[in-house]
C-alpha cells in the first residue's frame, strides 16, 4: 500500500489510507508519496498503529520494527506489544520483555507499566512483585493512568509493597479522574467498602455510573447491584434489570446470571422462566458457578425448561467442581436420594463433607442425618448430634430443631427437656415449621417450659399455616377440645382434613372420627371407614384397631370376623394393647 505524507515539513501526518481532502493535523491540502526513506521513527509508529487498527498485523509489525530499529521508545513498546499478543509475529514473552525493558529504560511510561505487569505475573521474567510495583511506580510518576491504577492495586492487596488502602484510594482517584475506567470501578469499590476512605455509597455509585457511561460491562453490572439492593439510592428493580441486561448483552456472565434471576422471579421485568434459562445457560457456559447452580435447579424442577435429572446432575457437577457449597449440597442430596443417579450415600457423605468444610451449615445437618440413620456410615447418635450442633450453632434452623429433638429423647446427649425447648425456640424463631410444632407440644404439656396452652396453639397455627400436616392435626385437636382456644368443631374438622390430605396418619384418623361422630361435619360412616383405612395403611395402630372394631361390629356393612381379626392382629403386632386383648378374645371364641 502506498504511503503519503503531508507536504508541510513541520506536520508529521502520514497514512496508507486514501489521501484526505485536507490534512487533519495542519489543514494543508497537498500530500506527497513516500517510499519510506524520508520517514522518521515516529512516522513508522503512526503507520504501525494505523495498520494495527485496520487489522493488518503483518504491516504493523514491520512498521514498529523499523521504528524500534532506530531506538524509538514508542516503537520498541509497540513492537513488544506485538510479541506479547502474537499479532504479526509468533508470540514470545521473552522478546516482549526485552523490548519493554529497552523502552522503559528510556522513560516510556506505557512500556514501564507493561514491564511491571510482566514482573507481577511472571511473563517472560521470574515473578517479582517488588519489581512490578517499582516499574508501576516509575510510570505512575509520569501520571500514566493505567500505571496509577496498577500501583493502586498493589497498595490495595499488599503486592510488592506494604498494603496501604489510603494510598491506593489516592492513586485510584488520580487514574479515575484521568478517565481510566478500571480505576473508576476500583475506586467505587473502595468507597463502597469504606477501605482507605469513608464509606459512601452515593459517591461509590457516582463512580460506577461514570464507568457505566463508557459502557463498561462490570460497571453496568455494579450499577445494577446498587439499584437492586438500594445502596446509595432508592431500590429500583426495573432500573437494576436494565443495567444487568446492558452488561449481559456484552457477554458479562455475572450480569447474565443476575438478569436471569430477574426474569425467573419477575423482578423488575415480566416473569419469563424460559428466557431466564437461556440467560442462565449463557452464563453457565462461561463457567459462572451461580448460573450453573441456578440452571441445575431449573432442570431439576422443570422451570423454564423440560424437567431433566440428567441435565440437573451435569450442571450441579460443574458448579460443585468449582467448590460452590450449595451445589455440593444439592449434588449430595441427589446421591443420597438416588435422584438422577444411582443411590450412593457414601458419595453423598463425601460431597456433604466438602460443602461443610466450606462452611455450609446445611451440609453439617445432612451429615448428621446420615449418621442418625446409619446410612452409608456406621450409625452413631453422638456423631450425628455433634454435626447437628455445629450447624445449629451456625444458626441453621433445621439443625437447631434436630438438636432439640436429640435433647428431648436423649439421643447422643443426656435427655434435657429444657435444652430441647430452647433449641426448638431458636429454630421456631426463624419460622421453621417443624420446630414451631415441637415447641408447641412443649408448651401444651409443659415440657421444658411452663405450661401455656394459648402459646401452644399460637405455635401450632404458625406451623399449620405453613402446611405442616402434624401441626395441622395438633391445631385441629386443640380446636376440637378447646385447648388454648375456643372449641370450634367445624374448624377442627377443617384442620384435620388438611392434615389428612397432607398424608399425616393421625390427621387421617382424627378426620375419620369426625365423620364417624358428626363432629364439625355431617356424619358419614363410609367416609369414616375410608379414612380409617388410609390411616391404617400408613401404619397407625389406632386406625388398625378401629377397623377391627368396625368389621367385628358391622358398622358399615356386614360383620366380618376374619377381617376384624386380621386388623386386630396387625394392630397388636404394632404394639396396640387393646388390639392384643381383642385377638386373645376372638381366638378363644374360635
Where in the sequence are the language-model features?
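Short helix-capping/linker turns of helical repeat alpha-solenoids
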Residues: 39, 69-72, 85-87, 92, ...
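Cys/His-coordinated zinc-binding microdomains
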Residues: 7-15, 27
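Short Cys/His-rich micro-motifs in 6-15 aa windows
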Residues: 27-36
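Residues immediately within or flanking Cys/His clusters that coordinate Zn2+
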Residues: 3-8, 20
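Hydrophobic face of amphipathic alpha-helices that form TPR/SEL1-like repeat modules
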Residues: 44-52, 78-85, 114-121, 150-157, ...
Amino acid at each position: 500500500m502506498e504511503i503519503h505524507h503531508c507536504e508541510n515539513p513541520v506536520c508529521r501526518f502520514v497514512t496508507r489510507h486514501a489521501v484526505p481532502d485536507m490534512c487533519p493535523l495542519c489543514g494543508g491540502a497537498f500530500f506527497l508519496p513516500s517510499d519510506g526513506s524520508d520517514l522518521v521513527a515516529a512516522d513508522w509508529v503512526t503507520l504501525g498503529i494505523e495498520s494495527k487498527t485496520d487489522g493488518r498485523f503483518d504491516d504493523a509489525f514491520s512498521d514498529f520494527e523499523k521504528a524500534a530499529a532506530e531506538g524509538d521508545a514508542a516503537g520498541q513498546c509497540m513492537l513488544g506489544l506485538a510479541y506479547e499478543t502474537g499479532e504479526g509475529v509468533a508470540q514470545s514473552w521473552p522478546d516482549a520483555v526485552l523490548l519493554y525493558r529497552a523502552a522503559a529504560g528510556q522513560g516510556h511510561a506505557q512500556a514501564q507499566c507493561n514491564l511491571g505487569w510482566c514482573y507481577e505475573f511472571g511473563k517472560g521474567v521470574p515473578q517479582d512483585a517488588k519489581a512490578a510495583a517499582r516499574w508501576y511506580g516509575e510510570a505512575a510518576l509520569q501520571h500514566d493512568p493505567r500505571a496509577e491504577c496498577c500501583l493502586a492495586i498493589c497498595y490495595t492487596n499488599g503486592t510488592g509493597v506494604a498494603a496501604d488502602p489510603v494510598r491506593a484510594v489516592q492513586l485510584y482517584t488520580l487514574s479515575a479522574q484521568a478517565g481510566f475506567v478500571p480505576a473508576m470501578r476500583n475506586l467505587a469499590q473502595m468507597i463502597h467498602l469504606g477501605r482507605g476512605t469513608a464509606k459512601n455509597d452515593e459517591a461509590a455509585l457516582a463512580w460506577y455510573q461514570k464507568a457505566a457511561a463508557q459502557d463498561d460491562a462490570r460497571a453496568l453490572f455494579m450499577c445494577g447491584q446498587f439499584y437492586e439492593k438500594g445502596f446509595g439510592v432508592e431500590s429500583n428493580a426495573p432500573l437494576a434489570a436494565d443495567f444487568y441486561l446492558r452488561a449481559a448483552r456484552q457477554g458479562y456472565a455475572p450480569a447474565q446470571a443476575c438478569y436471569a434471576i430477574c426474569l425467573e422471579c419477575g423482578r423488575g421485568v415480566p416473569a419469563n422462566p424460559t428466557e431466564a434459562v437461556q440467560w442462565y445457560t449463557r452464563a453457565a457456559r462461561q463457567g459462572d458457578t451461580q448460573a450453573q447452580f441456578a440452571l441445575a435447579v431449573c432442570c431439576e424442577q422443570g422451570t423454564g425448561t423440560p424437567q431433566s435429572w440428567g441435565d440437573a446432575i451435569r450442571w450441579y457437577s460443574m458448579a460443585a467442581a468449582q467448590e460452590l457449597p450449595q451445589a455440593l449440597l444439592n449434588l449430595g442430596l441427589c446421591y443420597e436420594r438416588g435422584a438422577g443417579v444411582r443411590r450412593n450415600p457414601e458419595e453423598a457423605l463425601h460431597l456433604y463433607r466438602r460443602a461443610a468444610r466450606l462452611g455450609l451449615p446445611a451440609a453439617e445437618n445432612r451429615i448428621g442425618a446420615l449418621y442418625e440413620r446409619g446410612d452409608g456410615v456406621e450409625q452413631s447418635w453422638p456423631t450425628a448430634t455433634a454435626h447437628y450442633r455445629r450447624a445449629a450453632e451456625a444458626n441453621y434452623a433445621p439443625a437447631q430443631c434436630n438438636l432439640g429433638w436429640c435433647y428431648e429423647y436423649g439421643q447422643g446427649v443426656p435427655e434435657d427437656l429444657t435444652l430441647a425447648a430452647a433449641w426448638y425456640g431458636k429454630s421456631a424463631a426463624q419460622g421453621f415449621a417443624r420446630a414451631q410444632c415441637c415447641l408447641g407440644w412443649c408448651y401444651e404439656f409443659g415440657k421444658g417450659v411452663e405450661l401455656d396452652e394459648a402459646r401452644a396453639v399460637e405455635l401450632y397455627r404458625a406451623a399449620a399455616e405453613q402446611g405442616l400436616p402434624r401441626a395441622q392435626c395438633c391445631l385441629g385437636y386443640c380446636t376440637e377440645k378447646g385447648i388454648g382456644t375456643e372449641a370450634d368443631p367445624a374448624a377442627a374438622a377443617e384442620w384435620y382434613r388438611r392434615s389428612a390430605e397432607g398424608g399425616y396418619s393421625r390427621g387421617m384418623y382424627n378426620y375419620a372420627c369426625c365423620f364417624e361422630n358428626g363432629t364439625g361435619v355431617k356424619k358419614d360412616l363410609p367416609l369414616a371407614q375410608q379414612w380409617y383405612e388410609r390411616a391404617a395403611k400408613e401404619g397407625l395402630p389406632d386406625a388398625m384397631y378401629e377397623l377391627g372394631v368396625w368389621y367385628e361390629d358391622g358398622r358399615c356393612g356386614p360383620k366380618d370376623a376374619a377381617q376384624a381379626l386380621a386388623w386386630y392382629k396387625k394392630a397388636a403386632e404394632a404394639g396396640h394393647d387393646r388390639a392384643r386383648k381383642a385377638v386373645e378374645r376372638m381366638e378363644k371364641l374360635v
